């Protein structure tokens, strides 16, 4: 009987380990996810703009992080420079042409662990109808149960630089900078139903 109990305990622990090792799917939180980008304005200043999250999903495999993935959609209707006239101009046809291309999307194609909490995330960025490969320098901030929501959560940041002209958005280059510096901060959580 003792042997049977031991075997049962071993089986339970093994099953628990499998569950803990399984990839976890997080839904990104629009209230705590921001994409900020800035550029040179004739060399005098470096104004910036904010893009809010439309939708986003992160699948994180803690045991095998190279199997992780992320997908996000950023509606240009959320673009905000804090200058109303500039918001409108950036969405017009000579820039982002938001009426024709209302979304910016990113789909990861590779996650490369660099040691510690650092990762290189490569993926397909689609903007203005053009898709190009982009590499993000990502930092995993924290994984665990959020003290307020009590849900399994994840937080990360990332940076990259892109040339807007490579996406067909080359108006006023080089006076208005071609290179965009992009900074991302994000939080996600497991759906409440998935934790029950």
Annotate the PLM regions:
Residues 9-13:
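Hydrophobic helical h-region of N-terminal Sec-dependent signal peptides
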Residues 1-8:
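Bacterial N-terminal signal peptides that target proteins for export
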Residues 21-196:
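Low-complexity, acidic/polar, glycine-enriched regions of mature
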Residues 15-18:
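N-terminal signal peptide c-region/cleavage motif recognized by signal peptidases
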